[in-house]
Amino acid sequence: MNKEILAVVEAVSNEKSLPREKIFEALEIALATATKKKYEQEIDVRVSINRKTGNFSTFRRWMVVDIVVHPTKEITLEAACFEGEQVKINDYVEDKIESVNFDRITTQTAKQVIVQKVREAERAMLVDQFRKHIGQIITGIVKKISRDNLTLDLGNNAEALILREGMLPRENFRPGDRIRGILYGVYPEARGAQLFLSRSKTEMLIELFRIEVPEIGEEVIEIKAAARDPGSRAKIAVKTNDKRIDPIGACVGMRGARVQAVSSELCGERIDIILWDDNPAQFVINAMAPADVVSIIVDEDHHTMDIAVDSSNLAQAIGRNGQNVRLASQISGWELNVMTTEDLRSKHKEEAYAAFNIFKKNLNVSEKVIKTLVKEGFSSLEELAYIPLNELLEINNLTEREVQLVREGAKNGLLLLELDQKNQIKNKKIEQALLNVNGMNELLALKLAEKNIFTVEELANQGIDDLIDIENLNSEQAGLLIMAARNICWFSSKV
C-alpha cells in the first residue's frame, strides 16, 4: 500500500501538472475523511503521510479551548495540562489511533475527496497564473453561448466568462469564434469559471491602442484618459513630452490604419482622438471635438463649465442623445452645460442682474462699485466675504474704504441670511436629523422643504430625478445625498 500511495501521488502530479505536496495534502485529507466515517461520533482526525516511504499514521485530535462546546473534538486547557500536555489555547492534543483499511467504501470516499482537492488545487493554480494578467487582453475560443454570457476556452483547461453587459450591443458570436477581451476579474472562491473578460470596459479600448501604437507601448505617448459608449463612440486623450511627435497622428496611423484596427475590433466604434491639456478649460474644448466651442466659462466651486457654441453647431456639440457632451464630460470629469451663444449671454445677463440685486440689498456702497464687482465676475456674498483681501484691493477703481465696506456688508449679509434660514427651518418644521445628513446644509434643507421633503425618511424615498432640478445640485451630489439618507434610515438601528 505504501508504494501504491507514492505511485498515485506521482501519477496525479504528472497528469495534472500539480506539485507533489498538493497531492500528498489531498491524500491526507481523503484518508482523514474516510477514517471519520468509521466512527459514529463526529471527531477530528489528522493523517500524516511520510513523503519518502509512503507510510502514514492516523491521529485523533482535540482543540484546546476555554469552554468546551463539542466534547468529541475539544478539550479544556486544564484537562489537557492535567494529562501532561504542554499546550496553550488553540493548540491540539493528539492520540494515535488505528489507520483505516482500504476497503471498497474507504477507497470510494478517498477518491471523491482527492478529486475535489485536486480540482481546488487546479483552480488555485489557475488563479495564480492569470492574476498577474489582470488588465491585459486575453484571447479565447467561444465554447458555449447562453442568454446571459459567453464561455471562452483559453486553453490548458482554463475557461473565462464574458457577461452580457461585457459585450458590445451588436455583437453576435458562434461556437468556435476567436475573440478578445480585457481580463478584469479573477475570483478563486467562484465555482466553474473564475476568470472574467469584458469587451465593453474602457480599459479594453486603452489596451487595444497600446497594442496597435508602438509609441504608447514604449511610453513615448501617454494615454491620459478615455471614455466610451461601447460599440458606438469613444474619446481618448493622449499627450507626449517629445515635441517631435504628433500624438494624434501617431494614434491615427498611416491612412488611419491604427485607429481603424481598433475600431474594427470594437464593431466599428467611432473613436475621437483628442489632445490632452493640463488646463481643464482647454481640455474640455478639445474634448468637445468635432464641435467648435465659441466660449467657455468655468465654475470651479460647482465643478461645472458653461460651453457656448453657434446655434448651427448646437446639435453636433450635444450629439445624438447627448452622446458627444456626455463623453466629453466623462473624459474631463467636469459637468458640462452646452448652449448657444445667445442662451449663454442671456443666462449670464440674468445671473448678473440677480447678483446686482443681492449686492445692492446687502452692501452699503454705490451702484458704480456694485457694477464693478459684477463685471469682475462676483456673483455671491460668500465670494466677497471670503476672497483674500488683497484680491479685492487689486480691483481697479476701488478704494480701500470701498473694499472695507464691501467686506463688512458681505459678512453681515451672510449672518442675516443664516439667521433667516434658521427661522425658516424652524417655521417649516424641518427635522433636525435631516440637517445632520452628510452633505446637507441649511440652504439645501430649505430647498428640499420647498419640495415637501422635511425628514430623512422622505429624502431616502426620493430618486435622483426628483432632486436634479434643485439649483447648484448636480446628479452626483443628489445621489450621494440620497444614499446618505438611506444609510441612516434603512441600514441604521436609529435615525
Curated annotation (Swiss-Prot):
Gene3D superfamilies: 3.30.300.20, 5' to 3' exonuclease, C-terminal subdomain, Nucleic acid-binding proteins, NusA, N-terminal domain. One of its GO terms (biological process) is DNA-templated transcription termination. The keyword Oxidoreductase does not apply. GO terms for cellular component: cytosol. GO terms for molecular function: DNA-binding transcription factor activity; nucleotide binding; RNA binding. Residues 364-489 are annotated as: 2 X 51 AA approximate repeats. It is found in: Cytoplasm. Transmembrane segments: none annotated. Pfam families: HHH_5, KH_5, NusA_N. PROSITE patterns: KH_TYPE_1, S1. Sequence repeats lie at residues 364-414, 439-489. InterPro entries: DNA_repair_Rad51/TF_NusA_a-hlx (IPR010995), KH_dom (IPR004087), KH_dom-like_a/b (IPR015946), KH_dom_NusA-like (IPR025249), KH_sf_prok-type (IPR009019), NA-bd_OB-fold (IPR012340), NusA_bac (IPR030842), NusA_N_sf (IPR036555). Residues 302-370 form the KH domain. Coiled coil: none annotated. It comes from the Bacteria. The keyword Ligase does not apply. Participates in both transcription termination and antitermination. Monomer. Binds directly to the core enzyme of the DNA-dependent RNA polymerase and to nascent RNA. Belongs to the NusA family. This is Transcription termination/antitermination protein NusA. The gene is nusA.
